[in-house]
């Protein structure tokens, strides 16, 4: 995670254009988006989540869904319990606000064959710890909704660097 002052200065930039920006409300909002996007992922469908994703993420998801369909695979994410929602980075760039959130959750994550229902990957009984960085963006000043613009694993460099 970025040093506190770097994060704080990014949040200050966002607040300069949108004084109503509130960290706690933002965390609640993105946690809601997290659940909605995960549900879309499980359904292998962009329908209903399209407006929550940037064009690049839409294309990425569509590609992943196509691959899963071709392989006859369904990725199941169940009993999702979000443990922590932490702001990791915030900045403005090219007229947009960006905030990266570090999600820590426990969930059942397994993949089944969509013909037989047989588990081909993962474990449907033992929850795993899930940690990912999700970056959300919107027009500076709050003129548009927050959308998911990137997903990174811990250890990967974040998209902007």
Model-derived segments and spans:
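Residues in flexible loops and secondary-structure boundaries
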Residues: 22, 60, 69, 85-95, ...
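Conserved NTP-handling cores and scaffolds of large molecular machines
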Residues: 14, 34, 41, 65, ...
């Amino acid at each position: 995670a970025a040093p506190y002052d770097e994060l704080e200065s990014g949040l200050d930039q966002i607040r300069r254009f949108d004084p109503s920006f509130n960290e706690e409300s933002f965390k609640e909002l993105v946690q809601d988006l997290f659940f909605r996007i995960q549900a879309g992922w499980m359904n292998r469908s962009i329908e209903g989540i399209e407006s929550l994703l940037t064009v690049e993420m839409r294309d990425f998801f569509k590609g992943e869904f196509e691959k899963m369909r071709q392989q006859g695979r369904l990725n199941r994410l169940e009993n999702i319990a979000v443990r922590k929602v932490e702001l990791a980075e915030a900045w403005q760039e090219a007229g947009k606000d960006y905030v990266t959130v570090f999600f820590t959750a426990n969930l059942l994550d397994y993949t089944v064959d969509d013909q037989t229902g047989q588990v081909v990957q993962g474990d449907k009984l033992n929850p795993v710890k899930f940690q990912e960085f999700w970056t959300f963006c919107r027009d500076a000043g709050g003129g548009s909704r927050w959308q998911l613009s990137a997903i990174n694993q811990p250890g990967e460099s974040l998209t902007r660097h």
